[in-house]
Amino acid sequence: MKFKLLVFAFFVVATSMAQHKISGIVKDSVGNPLEMANIIAINQSTKGLESYFITDAKGYYKLNLSNNATFELRISYLGFASKTFVVSTSDAQKDMTKDFVLYENSDKLNEVELTYEMPVTIKGDTLIYNADSFTNGKEKKLGDVLKKLPGVEITDEDEVEVDGKKVSKIMVDGKDFFDGDSKLAVKNIPADAISKVEVLKNYNEVSQMKGLGNDEDNVALNIKLKQGKKNFWFGEVTAGGGPDDRYLAHPKLFYYSPKKSVNIITDFNNIGEVPFTFRDYFSFSGGFKNMNRRSGSNFNTSSNSLGLSMAKNNRAKEIETKFGALNFSYAPNKALDLNGFAIYSYTKTDMQTNATVTTLTNAFSNVENQQNNTLQTSQLGLLKFSAQYKPSLNFQLDYDVFLKNSNLEEVNNINSVSSITGDNTIDINKDDNPFSVNQNLNIYYTLNAKNIFSVAVQQLYERGNPLYNSLNTDQRFTILPAIDEAGSRFDLTQLKKLVTNKLDATIDYYYVLNDQSNINVTFGSSFNEQDLNTHIFQTLDNNTKIDFNADTLNNDVNFNFTDVYLGLHYKVITGNFTFTPGLKWHSYSYKNIQLGEELKQNPTKLLPDVFVKFDIKKSENITFNYNASTEFTDVNNLAEGLFLRNYNSLFSGNKNLTNPLYHNYTLRYFNFNMFSFTNIFGTINYSKKFNTIKSSATLLGIDRISSTINSSLPEDTFSANLRYSKRYGKLKTNASSRVSISNFNNIINGDVSNSKTTTQDYTASVATNFKKGPNFTVGYQTTVNDYETTRTTSTFTTDRPFANLEVPFFKSFTLLANYSYYNYSDKANTIKNNYTFLDADLYFQRDKSKWEFKLSVTNLLNTGSLNQDSFSEFITSTSQYFIQPRYWLLSLKYNL
């Protein structure tokens, strides 16, 4: 069977490669090559677009044409009269060379109307893909379309990357789609509504600011809709059901016009498809940017302080979700633009994990077997309103307000059997209701061609009230004065309240020297205040509460942090080089009051940075970036009273922590050849860390007491990424590699040891893209993790062959299948785990019908669990994580 599949794949590849080639040069009347002239080949029998090319800098073109056919070549260039040429191919005919000379058209830019649009066109910094040129009509969502575009990748987290850079915003007809969130866009925008995909490189939302700074890392997508989708409501309604009360309901509705847009997305299911996780919730910025990122210093507030469990690979034993989202935009006039969104998500997740944890130190050894059952519910709410006022090209005002509110609950039941402590049953309850409101005001003003100003003010209010409760048959820590009631479990509760107020402001002044250079002066400030209160108590069998009032067991901390800084940058473009050196001077002041003492520190820092770009040619460049940065921890790591982190883990902060210093170096190479659809992207990054904040842990059997310290030992990280993709006719090849090396230090039981981790990831794949007939993707991924310490060395390898299949048959049927095989092992041959996932979907839809029927089988091979292992110098963990069993679902979709 494997041999037959191999022969079939070879036959498909060989057939696609058996083509006739015609190449040559396109020149003007005096012999100068014409770069970016368009050449298309129309099959005279089918009247379809057979091949196309855009000439390179030397005017060169190359077309691949099918044998035994006649084609009309159409050659065009803006401002020149077009030409046509008829050519016939045959098996016996050799490859052909043909040059073309175009003559300037003085009357009109181009009199010939092209019947077919070019698959790819370039307009300045915008790369425009004609979606129909890369798709075959079987695509369902935007993500399916983007995967077929050269240079565009979709990550496992549904983030979009172009040339290795994360897309910061996705728009539809120029309007933000849920503030540009990529996951909601790739999963919900219907593929059949897409006309073009515009890649906006060097993107800047404010036209006045474009080109003043370095926007090379800013990439946005604009999805252009087909004409039939404008000024009309469109969308789809999907409903389905299956055995064991499986259900799915997924209505979506969209409306776009020049003045307004509405997007409505809903999703109700219990089949494990989670449209919006609380990982998405915590990372969802609402379009708000970190204002201090360019300043070189960061003050980051903690999120998910409860330490909630995360689903692995978006899978769990059972998942039920209810999701609803509304996004709108409205432009009452040319000067004012209003938009906003509301999102609600409810998810109930049932997780089960069995684990064996082995601890081996110089003082003791212990083996603990755990069975952990977790029931987690989350209700997440987000609300945002934005207004943009732009009465002229010289003035723009933006205002945003963004609210986030949630209710998070988690119940854990843990059975622990330890070689030291014996049997133990633990029930853990976690609850939190975090709330935040973020406001943003931006003003951009162009006084004249030489003087440009921008002002930004951002305010954040954040509140959290996490509750932690545990019922434990053992008293884990003698430091806690718990009362031992015979035959009862220890009932401990920790209440925590954290309030954060943050106000950031910056003023930027740009003095434009000429078209190639400008000077930027920045004055900024950041004011932060945090109030933290924690309290631990025990509840007895008669519901009496025993408060632990010792100062070391509670926290009452007030923390203030202020950063005032002045920055200077100079940008100059000379020849093919862009050079931007900069310097920031920071004056910091931070104060924390706890345990009756006040601690103040007033450090200053001078942080340099430099950006260099060398344009080898229009679509090939090298960039280098260096910056020095520093980071300040929030109050959670400074509070010295005890925190209950888990049934076997306590934590205490360190009020004397100081800020670490980072030196970051990044070198990037980018090359996109749209003439051959070859994309090469590479990055090398090196980061050196000084005065790092480290966790210092004391292990006592299965228990751990941790704190934080500043380490004088330097640590560094090196990483390199390389991605290569190329198209050969109907074949798309991809290859990528990632390597990272980290040197860091562990402090356990007072001993300091150096550790080195090396991660290597290599992936290669081949995919076909035929308009008719089967399509497939086959690939192989291998990941190697090396962990080296002063005591031991371990190597873990994961091999994953994967394949995707798309088979249309009987005109109205399409079969889709996705297969992945995981093989996990270690170099010492002590671990060997493997599991397989196979999902299949059978679609039925008549031509031009609005109805679609779908039969889905998920986890077809009924894989019951995922096996995972982790390793450190003292602790080795092997876990079995259970997932949803095989199920099938019959669904019906109606396209509106």
Predicted features along the sequence, with ranges:
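Short, acidic Ser/Thr/Gly-rich low-complexity loop/linker segments typical of extracellular
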Residues: 45-60
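Outer membrane beta-barrel strand-and-loop segments of large Gram-negative receptors
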Residues: 371, 548-554, 652, 658, ...
